[in-house]
């Protein structure tokens, strides 16, 4: 299945708009290039709607969060939704601070995300409206492991169904759940 997904990306060579963590921006660009896409980075509110319009998808990462980037995230997300483009959210640090948590919750309320990926604490914060995260790391008491795997799978399936999105919990074990796919998306 992964080969088919990569073949599809290479065939379409989409431009992907990224509003991402400044620390990883180069890595994100290189991964997109390696997969056959073409990255462009912009979080400037006056720029994002135009940039999003020429792209095939949007990647939003809360790693480097500030008020200007939030405005850019919302504008780009709304424009992507208008265009029917897939939108990915990485809610870095949701649950670690009120500012990050409120931002992540506002984003998932206002924007339809195709993919939501984060550690278990971040995803639970999105699902329940509050949570605790140790910086950008999951709370170790919540980590997905062999003992709680079935419970974690039930949780992620329920959240994926509620958000009509592919949901990925990252960690030692990486459960993925999807219930609805649009014509242009591949699991």
Say what each PLM segment does:
Residues 36-79:
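Active-site cofactor/substrate anionic-group-binding motifs, chiefly glycine-
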Residues 1-41:
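Glycine-rich phosphate/adenosyl-contacting loop at the front of the ribokinase-like
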Residues 36, 82-84, 164:
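Glycine-centered short loops/turns at secondary-structure junctions
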Residues 180-187:
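Single conserved hydrophobic/aromatic residue that forms the stacking wall/gate
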Residues 32, 77-80, 160:
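A generic structural signal for well-ordered alpha-helical segments
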Residues 80, 85-109, 115:
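Glycine/small-residue-rich loop that forms an oxyanion/phosphate-binding "nest" at active or ligand-binding sites
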Residues 100-178:
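Conserved phosphate/ATP/ADP-binding segment of small-molecule kinases
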């Amino acid at each position: 299945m992964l080969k088919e997904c990569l073949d599809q990306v290479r065939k379409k060579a989409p431009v992907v708009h990224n509003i991402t963590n400044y620390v990883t921006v180069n890595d994100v660009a290189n991964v997109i290039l390696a997969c056959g896409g073409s990255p462009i980075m912009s979080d400037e509110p006056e720029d994002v709607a135009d940039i999003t319009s020429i792209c095939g998808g949007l990647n939003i990462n809360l790693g480097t969060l500030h008020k200007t980037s939030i405005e850019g995230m919302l504008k780009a997300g709304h424009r992507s939704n208008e265009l029917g483009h897939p939108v990915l959210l990485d809610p870095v640090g949701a649950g670690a601070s009120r500012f990050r948590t409120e931002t992540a919750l506002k984003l998932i309320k206002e924007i339809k995300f195709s993919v939501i990926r984060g550690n278990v604490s971040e995803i639970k914060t999105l699902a329940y409206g509050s949570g605790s995260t140790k910086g950008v790391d999951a709370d170790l008491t919540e980590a997905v492991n062999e003992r709680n795997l079935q419970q974690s799978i039930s949780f992620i399936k329920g959240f994926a169904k509620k958000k009509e999105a592919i949901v990925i919990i990252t960690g030692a074990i990486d459960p993925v759940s999807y219930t609805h796919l649009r014509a242009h998306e591949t699991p």
